[in-house]
Amino acid sequence: CQQPVKPGLCEAYIPRFFYNTSSKQCEKFIYGGCGGNSNRFLTMKACQDKC
């Protein structure tokens, strides 16, 4: 949850959620499909439950 959002290196268009440490809430971002980090969640609820 503390890592910055990282969309990844590929060019897919996959909606995911990450925890924004500045706003202190989960937000939507577009994941590229590969790479990235562990601050990436399938649903808003999963992000909120974890972070």
Curated annotation (Swiss-Prot):
Keywords: Disulfide bond, Ion channel impairing toxin, Nematocyst, Neurotoxin, Potassium channel impairing toxin, Protease inhibitor, Secreted, Serine protease inhibitor, Toxin, Voltage-gated potassium channel impairing toxin
Entry-linked InterPro entries: Kunitz_BPTI, Kunitz_BPTI_sf, Prtase_inh_Kunz-CS, TFPI/VKTCI-like
GO cellular component: extracellular space; nematocyst
Keyword set includes Secreted: yes
SMART domains referenced in this protein's UniProt entry, alphabetically: KU (SM00131)
Source species, domain of life: Eukaryota
Protein name (record): Kunitz-like toxin PcKuz3
